[in-house]
């Protein structure tokens, strides 16, 4: 078995160096016996043995796509974890012009064009709601599955041993994509006795931010998991203030959500978040509608119920890890019935 892992960032390098948790490899790290080179690894015998190669594909040119297309014929499976090539190769696959099995994680709707004009042999979604939305546009017998993404808790447990964990902040907002930081800042003004920190870069400073208030800015140009771990350990509650969207939200904020699960942090997020139902069903956080009154209420509730939410998240974390994702992924990659 030969697998080609395709992503738009080289997580395998950072995971190998221990500076990034392995859930950024979307289940394959647990299948690896050892790396032969920085970009190539041998699979464990229980996963059929064989080899997995890693390739970064970000905004490829036509020539780069042609070269990659030719390369793919040497593999049994192409695992596209961030939909980097499935639009192009999926069209070829639909017309039986793509030899390997194409397994794709679909993250953000709308899915209609991708489902109609391209075909992945196995389409993976992080929630049942996203999967059901995609199926509305499918008219063939392709495999469509839900496989919920969860964190590699061991990475957090090991790395937090050497870090300070005294709580300095009540709230952490550490995302950039589709976040309403200004709404969060306005709500914090209603809570002058509490403190928060927002992770951003100098090009995207929230317009509502005023120096000297109860919200600090932490500047970071490139993602750094160890830095985020330190901030998480200094904070009680994670806030994911997703922007309002009339359409279904994809798993935006999922990386921050992984941090909360691994560390037992209660979470506050938009009721339209992809993982909102899971939060409610397991009592691990508070949801809000996108207005100041609702968010402020959710922030207050998360502190009032902190111990209960924290304990529930710790319990949830114990039974929801990347190993569950790997177990299901193994079936998809090797064409086993699920």
Please name every model-derived segment:
Residues 121-158:
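Donor nucleotide-sugar binding/catalytic pocket of nucleotide-sugar-dependent glycosyltransferases
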Residues 290-292, 304-334:
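A charged, aromatic-enriched C-terminal amphipathic alpha-helix characteristic of glycosyltransferases
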């Amino acid at each position: 078995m030969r697998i080609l892992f395709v992503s738009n960032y080289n997580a395998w390098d950072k995971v190998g160096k221990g500076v990034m948790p392995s859930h950024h490899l979307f289940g394959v790290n647990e299948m690896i016996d050892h790396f032969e080179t920085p970009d190539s690894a041998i699979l464990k015998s229980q996963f059929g043995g064989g080899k997995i190669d890693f390739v970064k594909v970000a905004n490829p040119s036509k020539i780069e796509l042609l070269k990659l297309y030719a390369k793919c014929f040497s593999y049994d499976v192409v695992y596209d974890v961030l939909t980097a090539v499935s639009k192009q190769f999926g069209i070829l696959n639909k017309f039986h012009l793509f030899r390997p099995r194409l397994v794709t994680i679909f993250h953000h709707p709308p899915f209609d064009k991708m489902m109609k004009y391209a075909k992945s042999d196995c389409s993976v979604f992080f929630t049942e709601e996203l999967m059901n939305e995609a199926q509305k546009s499918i008219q063939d017998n392709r495999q469509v599955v839900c496989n919920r993404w969860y964190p590699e808790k061991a990475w957090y447990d090991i790395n937090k041993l050497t870090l300070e964990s005294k709580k300095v902040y009540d709230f952490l907002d550490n995302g950039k994509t589709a976040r309403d930081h200004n709404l969060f800042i306005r709500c914090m003004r209603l809570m002058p006795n509490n403190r928060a920190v927002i992770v951003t870069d100098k090009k995207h400073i929230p317009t509502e931010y005023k120096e000297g208030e109860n919200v600090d800015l932490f500047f970071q140009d490139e993602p750094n998991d160890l830095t985020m771990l330190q901030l998480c350990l200094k904070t009680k509650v994670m806030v994911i203030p997703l922007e309002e969207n009339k359409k279904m939200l994809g798993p935006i904020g999922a990386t921050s959500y992984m941090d909360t699960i691994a560390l037992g942090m209660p979470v506050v997020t938009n009721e339209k978040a992809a993982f909102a139902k899971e939060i409610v069903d397991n009592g691990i956080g508070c949801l809000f509608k996108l207005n100041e009154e609702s968010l402020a209420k959710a922030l207050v509730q998360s502190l009032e119920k902190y111990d209960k939410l924290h304990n529930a998240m710790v319990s949830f974390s114990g039974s929801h890890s990347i190993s569950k994702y790997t177990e299901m992924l193994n079936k998809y990659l090797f064409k086993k019935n699920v």
